[in-house]
Design a protein with these regions (language model features):
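Cyclophilin-like peptidyl-prolyl cis-trans isomerases
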Residues: 1-167
């Protein structure tokens, strides 16, 4: 199962680990299918570490808070799996503010990040050479002192490939 995030810097194809983390996969795929991520900015970028996205493009609290929400309306529990680790470039993981605070935001690592193992739910990884090129372009974006990209970088749209949740 995979999705392609079409960004203004190129495509990121992500293999989603549906069987290992079913609730996280369901949330991510449903948000993708509902166009939730269309226009979502890459709002935090730390070269050598990660890039974060997944907040709504047009937040309007309380239904769609700036920090994002899950398909269930609030946060949901972690699905930490010892076999799923932040062990290579392109691993995709849920962003959170502590245990059980997953919503819609996620990040992609630029390198190994073992200090995140056990803290953030890994739910996918980038696949293909084009994804690696796009990650390199993302990592090269200049940032300000608060790790915000100085240029606009967004998810323009998402393509779902063989969605097992489709009815």
């Amino acid at each position: 199962m995979s999705v392609t995030l079409h960004t203004n810097l190129g495509d990121l194809k992500i293999e989603v680990f549906c069987e290992s983390v079913p609730k996280t996969a369901e949330n991510f795929l449903a948000l993708c299918a509902s166009n939730y991520y269309d226009g979502s900015p890459f709002h935090r970028l730390i070269p050598g570490f990660m890039v974060q996205t997944g907040q709504p493009a047009n937040p309007s609290p309380p239904e769609n808070p700036k920090g994002g929400r899950s398909i269930w309306g609030g946060n949901f529990e972690d699905e930490i799996r010892p076999a799923l680790r932040h062990n290579e470039r392109g691993v995709v993981s849920m962003a959170n503010k502590g245990p059980g605070t997953n919503g819609s935001q996620f990040f992609l690592v630029f390198d190994k990040a073992p200090h995140l193992d056990g803290l953030n739910t890994v739910f996918g990884k980038t696949i293909g050479d084009e994804s690696l090129r796009t990650l390199a372009k993302l990592e090269a974006v200049e940032v300000d002192k608060k790790n915000r990209p100085k240029e606009k970088v967004v998810i323009e749209r998402v393509t779902i490939h063989a969605n097992p949740l489709a009815e």
